[in-house]
Amino acid sequence: MTDERDDTPATVTQNPWQALRRLTPARIALGRAGVSLPTRPQLAFQAAHAQARDAVHLPFDPAALQAQLHAQGHATLLLHSAARDRDQYLQRPDLGRQLDAPSAQLLGDHAAAHPGGVDIALVVADGLSALAVHRHAAPLIAGVAEGVRAQGWSMAPIALVEQGRVAVADEVGERLGARMVVILIGERPGLSSPDSLGLYFTYAPRVGLTDAARNCISNVRPEGLGYAAAAHKLLYLMREAWRRQGSGVLLKEAAEVPLLEAGRRNFLLD
């Protein structure tokens, strides 16, 4: 029997940058099958898109997060925005920036029972990815709270807001009489990151502020900005805002972070 060499061209043409794929979750060097994507990356894209859609509609579980925070020794307040459900939240962004009447009353009662205000108010909202909050809020808060205690700042009970958007933190902070407010919120899911957590920090919060008054730290998750690094950056912003009495465009995030030492040469230079 004579061996015959198969000269049929490979179905998938590999990309010369394929070695770079192990360094990033980004969709690079996927190769091609003719003029189209190969089947495997096409299916992976569809799966990632489905994960992103699921993250947007995943119901927030404030009771589970509340239990985690209670285990850390934190008091909590369960609140709700003026958006009655997920559909209205997505269609009416303005309602996600406001508290409903019972939540506003609850904060008013708490503030009346604790006159004088507080230094820090922490707010957690589901945003566009409850998955991010479920996975990352509690471990991040543990690091932030430790830094807040080290500064000697007072902290209000952590407010858990269902169907909340970023600006709802301004109302929470104002009603609690907080000098500074931080909201941890699920970011809009991406095709490689359905669980990214965002932090928004504001000094002297009040209803009606714009994004110019806020500082943002984004993509908080183990595959992005780790918990320790995010807490470090946030505490830097808090200290500087306290000193300068301002945030947003008045405050530049310039926290020093430790540099990683390379364990080997950059393969691009070899």
Swiss-Prot record:
Binds between the large and small subunits. Its EC number is 4.3.1.7. GO terms for cellular component: ethanolamine ammonia-lyase complex; ethanolamine degradation polyhedral organelle. It comes from the Bacteria. It holds the Pfam family EutC. Keywords: Bacterial microcompartment, Cobalamin, Cobalt, Lyase. Its main location: other. The keyword Lyase applies. The basic unit is a heterodimer which dimerizes to form tetramers. The heterotetramers trimerize; 6 large subunits form a core ring with 6 small subunits projecting outwards. This is Ethanolamine ammonia-lyase small subunit.
